[in-house]
């Protein structure tokens, strides 16, 4: 796998390919088999662990927990049928817009 920003797309492709495969042979397949609720729960747990690492542990721990969080987010996206390109497009749309203005525009919809 690449060591640049494309790694997320590559990882997403691998993750999506595990959907419907043998859960005894793949942790990712096991997550899919357990359903969206479990996937979302695991993402939430990893997000909390990332926050804890940021507040009380070293950079190495933060990096590791961040990788776990991103992995579980990608599993959640794959389960929901959301491809990374859609998220990147939304981030690009928001680039150059202040967070305050962007939030105001969502409130009006």
UniProtKB/Swiss-Prot annotation:
<keyword id="KW-0067">ATP-binding</keyword>
<keyword id="KW-0028">Amino-acid biosynthesis</keyword>
<dbReference type="InterPro" id="IPR021130">
    <property type="entry name" value="PRib-ATP_PPHydrolase-like"/>
</dbReference>
<protein>
    <recommendedName>
        <fullName>Phosphoribosyl-ATP pyrophosphatase</fullName>
        <ecNumber>3.6.1.31</ecNumber>
    </recommendedName>
</protein>
<comment type="pathway">
    <text>Amino-acid biosynthesis; L-histidine biosynthesis; L-histidine from 5-phospho-alpha-D-ribose 1-diphosphate: step 2/9.</text>
</comment>
<dbReference type="Pfam" id="PF01503">
    <property type="entry name" value="PRA-PH"/>
</dbReference>
<keyword id="KW-0963">Cytoplasm</keyword>
<keyword id="KW-0378">Hydrolase</keyword>
<dbReference type="InterPro" id="IPR008179">
    <property type="entry name" value="HisE"/>
</dbReference>
<dbReference type="GO" id="GO:0005524">
    <property type="term" value="F:ATP binding"/>
</dbReference>
<dbReference type="GO" id="GO:0004636">
    <property type="term" value="F:phosphoribosyl-ATP diphosphatase activity"/>
</dbReference>
<dbReference type="GO" id="GO:0000105">
    <property type="term" value="P:L-histidine biosynthetic process"/>
</dbReference>
<keyword id="KW-0368">Histidine biosynthesis</keyword>
<comment type="similarity">
    <text>Belongs to the PRA-PH family.</text>
</comment>
<dbReference type="GO" id="GO:0005737">
    <property type="term" value="C:cytoplasm"/>
</dbReference>
<keyword id="KW-0547">Nucleotide-binding</keyword>
């Amino acid at each position: 796998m690449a060591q640049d920003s494309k790694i997320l797309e590559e990882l997403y492709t691998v993750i999506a390919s595990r959907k419907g495969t043998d859960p005894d042979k793949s942790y990712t397949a096991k997550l899919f088999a357990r359903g969206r609720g479990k996937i979302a729960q695991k993402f939430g747990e990893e997000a909390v662990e990332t926050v804890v690492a940021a507040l009380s542990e070293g950079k190495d721990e933060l990096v590791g927990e961040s990788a776990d969080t991103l992995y579980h987010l990608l599993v959640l996206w794959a389960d929901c049928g959301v491809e990374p390109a859609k998220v990147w497009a939304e981030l690009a749309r928001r680039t150059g817009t202040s967070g305050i203005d962007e939030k105001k525009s969502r409130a009006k919809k």
